[in-house]
Amino acid sequence: MAKKIQFRRLLMLAILLGLAFAGLGYRLVDLQVLRHEELGEKAQRNRQVELFREPRRGDILDIKGNLLATSIFVKTACADPVLIGNQQATVARAIAPWLQMGEGELYQRLLLRTRQNESGQTVTNRYVVLKRKVPAETWQKIRETMAQLPFGVDEKKLSRSEAGFYRDLRQKAIFADPIDDQLRVYPNQALVAHVLGYVGMNEREINGRRFTGISGTDGIELILNAKLAGVPGWRVTETDNRRREVVDLREQDVDPHDGLNAVLTIDSVMQHTARVALADAMARHSPLSASCVVVRPRTGEILALATLPDFDPNNPGAVGLDARRNRVICDVVEPGSTFKIIVVSAALNEGVVTLADVFDCEKGHFAYAGKVLHDHEPYGVLSVESIITKSSNIGAAKIGIKLGPSALYRYMTDFGFGSRTGIPLAGEVAGIVHPLKNWSKLSISRIPMGHEVAVTPLQMVMAMCAIANRGCLMRPLLVDRLEDRKGNVVAQYQPQRVRQVISEATARQMVEALKTVVSPEGTAAQAALEHYTVAGKTGTAQKTVEGVRGYAPGKYFSTFIGFLPADNPELCIAVFLDEPKGGYYGGQVAAPIFKRIAERAANYMNIQPDVEPQPALAGNAAAGPAERPGRVASTTGEATD
């Protein structure tokens, strides 16, 4: 009986063992045969990675080779909590200052943590990101600190395994990602912010591969992004369980091609001069904004383009969109009296008038098309030249009427209004020039004084440059050339002539008229320079109210645009103030800023003086007659005094 029971037990044990071995065998067959390919691919995916190798983004430099934007490669500092063991406090205390983190925060990140993987298994996290964008110099300090880190034990008395723990802790516990990140740096901060723009992180696809890297978001960074960005590389390799590359298992390694460097026409010294003068204007007059553009009339080269308020492209998100907007190309305003140069140029070029021709300005009260236009002074008979000198609204209107709508419209568009200038910056608008069919009977008397038309500050500057450049309109030139990393010129950008708007003879006549604006009898006496003749025009435009017919009381856009030396211009300088306080006439608030910039710019560029100093002009601070915005009957919805 006992033998029978023992036999049954042995039989049951044999059956159980057989079933166990059968299950194990099936599992082995399932893993090694039936699902071998599937599991092999999954294992390969778990280990194999494709690493993006970002090319070095090209530098941006000014015309003198000064660095405006550059890129540095930075580390991502990581930790393996397993190798740190129970030394979190010691490690945190040692490297927290280098990472600019609190010890408590870093201590928490170094703690050992577990998680559930896809199979439901508990795994330990051996890859913890501590800090991104760590400069290479800082990373080296961290490595040196870890290598010399004391732990308060006599390591000579440690066992082999204990000594190995401390060795791995020093050498491997804190590590960096295998591929560095790229950080865009703007050394001069806000100096050229609205020209340079800034970058952000964007995804792009090359050869079927999708990469995420820095990309231009605004300004030159956006417009020249394809040239600056370069071509990414990639690396197909395998990593260990701490996401560190196993170099011997690399399958592909394609080198990136660095981006090109861009050399701008901007001169940092000129830009600084303009920006300092604008900052002073902001302090004195508290305008909503202040802008300045400095151009070489003969070539269209932009030497300075500044707008305040501005922003630091190293941290563009610190300010709102309003401060990041490039008002020189994005904002449109009624230009006011600066637009009188267009109607007078057109009339002279068409032979409709001469500078000596006279018009009756009717003591400052002119009725036309059922409305009344006023001058700021009760002028009687004025010559065409004096109409420019005194900035007479009635005189400009009568010249426009004599010229006619078709001719005026043609010259407006020929001077570039209603079209983008083509400057390589994002966000430029075309302004507003209404087609002839939409003009009212009143338009021909209002457009000559800068009403019923909206322009960008840059359009107005380039129109003045055309007069200074013997009647030839140029395209703004902002990028001088592209170079490779070795300094070889890849592309050279030449000045571009748009069209001959007026004849050279007409341009010379306009220069003579515009010189008188800066005389003691003109509206911009405060723009006069001691050693140089200046030609220019003031503007004081009453601002419209968005969505409301008419103009905003007490809100003005003040302008002065001038060039020097007047007969052989090297520089055209424009200053714009939006809603200045404590004075608003262009000759009163913008002209002195022009003078300050022009004096420093002429000295810096060693421009040859064209006049002998005159004691009466030295330190001239006397204001000449100030032009005022046109006044019409309030029922018209146009500007009033």
PLM feature spans:
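Hydrophobic alpha-helical transmembrane signal-anchor segments
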Residues: 4-38
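Beta-lactam-recognizing serine transpeptidase/beta-lactamase-like catalytic domain environment
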Residues: 7, 69, 238-253, 257, ...
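Short, basic/aromatic recognition patches
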Residues: 40-53, 270-285
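Juxtamembrane extramembrane loops of integral membrane proteins
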Residues: 51, 55-100
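Envelope-exposed proteins and targeting segments
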Residues: 54-57, 73-77, 91, 124-126, ...
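Solvent-exposed, polar/charged alpha-helical surfaces in well-ordered, non-transmembrane soluble domains
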Residues: 75, 89-93, 97, 108, ...
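Small/polar-residue-rich segments within soluble enzyme cores
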Residues: 91-97, 114-258, 575, 592-595
